[in-house]
Amino acid sequence: MAEFQGYLELDRSWKHDLLYPLIFREYIYVFAHDLGLNRSNLLENVGYDNKSSLLIVKRLISRMYQQNHFIISANDSNQNQLFGYNKNLYSQMISEGFAVIVEIPFSLRLVSSLKGTEIVKYYNLRSIHSIFPFLEDKFSQLNYVSDVLIPYPIHLEILVQTLRYWVKDASSLHLLRFFLHDYYNWNTLIIPNKYISIFSKSNPRLFLFLYNSHVCEYESILLFLRNQSSHLRLTSSGGFFERIYFYGKIKHPVEEVFANDSPTSLWFLEDLFMHYVRYQGKSILASKDTPLFMNKWKYYLVLLWQCHFYVWSQPGRMYINQLCKHSFSFLGYLSSMQINLSVVRSQMLENSFLMDNAMKKIDTLVPISLLIGSLDKMKFCNVLGHPVSKSTWADSSDFDIIDRFVCICRNLFHYYSGSSKKKSLYRIKYILRLSCVKTLARKHKSTVRTFLKKLGSNLLEEFFTEEEEVLSLIFPRTYSALRRSYKGRIWYLDIFCINDLVNHK
């Protein structure tokens, strides 16, 4: 960011909220290319080549404004060449460059806030790491939960409209509209409901920025409603009703105002606190109150999506479940409420009596069927969970093959360290271990039994090394003291970067 700010010091247009001239600066695309190379492995790198040229990008932008958008040819959509150039390459270049440009106001605002003397505190917004203590401490006190899938907008134009509150440069927004419109014309044979899905895969950085802006506005409105409800709830109910009774007598001195009517008319102000948790496109609403209260918030969300974001959502698809009877999927875990019943005998003087004590505890399980489906998609096993050889890795060295399998296995154990039961993970380890052996046997053109007899089982000894054993070898004193003082599950702070099941599809 410091290097990028050095370029911006030479270009004064951004200080006047003019981002449009930056689209014609070559360092923007160089910076976007460097970001693509240094990006996390969760996103694929953009395939720039040596033939890319800023001059062609300028010509392509000029042609966007000149061509007739009312004439669309279905035959032209199948052509890989646009004006004699590779349309996929330069559409990705413009997308990556524009994503960098629209992020400038947010980045500079963040840098300026960090340099200031007073840092604005957002008490309602938390890091993703706060989800784990929430599951451990507060979730067991709740009764009802509703897992909500945040709907995608029907058209990307809705995402562009959200940027109007953040980006004040109208020329940049017009260019973004032209680009999205042209991208749709280049792919006119795409089914409309799959358009956003394809755009998100080919232009991940720009789509993530647009979608995050959309979710940010949605959550700001939702948190405003939630805060208003909580502030009204915190008002003293006795004094609140007394003031209403007093003002009622002043306004209608002849008529009698019944205090019993006030709680009925203002019942909706006494709602208990609503908990909201989100990761990517999936969120959870949880409360200790009745299902009627949850239904009210469900229709709040539906009306918010339909009236403000013009997104159709069916209320019937948002299910409200009781935690003690249903489980829900979130962050790659299958979570449910486990109730442990115990009987306590109490004696006072000569009288003794029995008390039933119910202890609630959150139970986080490994979704074995989803994990097997993920391994089947990556060709480590079949649909039934039977291990198969990874044919695409057979050309690698033995060390690389074993290292890849061991890395996947340890990452899964690392991710599901917060699971209540590890039995399903040992099945996943068995699948990966046998798939590794079959891959090595295929490379050496041998059978599994012959290969193991020749090299021995010590070759795959790393598969049997638990992560807890690795930690005990690295930090022997600290880890032994930790295990003596704490017997519960362990949540690692980097787990959301590992498991592909967490990424909401």
Swiss-Prot record:
Keywords: Chloroplast, mRNA processing, Plastid, RNA-binding, tRNA processing. Transmembrane segments: none annotated. It is found in: Plastid, Chloroplast. Disulfide bonds: none annotated. InterPro entries: Domain_X (IPR024937), Maturase_MatK (IPR002866), Maturase_MatK_N (IPR024942). GO terms for cellular component: chloroplast. Its main location: plastid. GO terms for biological process: mRNA processing; RNA splicing; tRNA processing. GO terms for molecular function: RNA binding. The keyword RNA-binding applies. Usually encoded in the trnK tRNA gene intron. Probably assists in splicing its own and other chloroplast group II introns. HAMAP family: MatK. Belongs to the intron maturase 2 family. MatK subfamily. This is Maturase K. It comes from Morus indica (Mulberry).
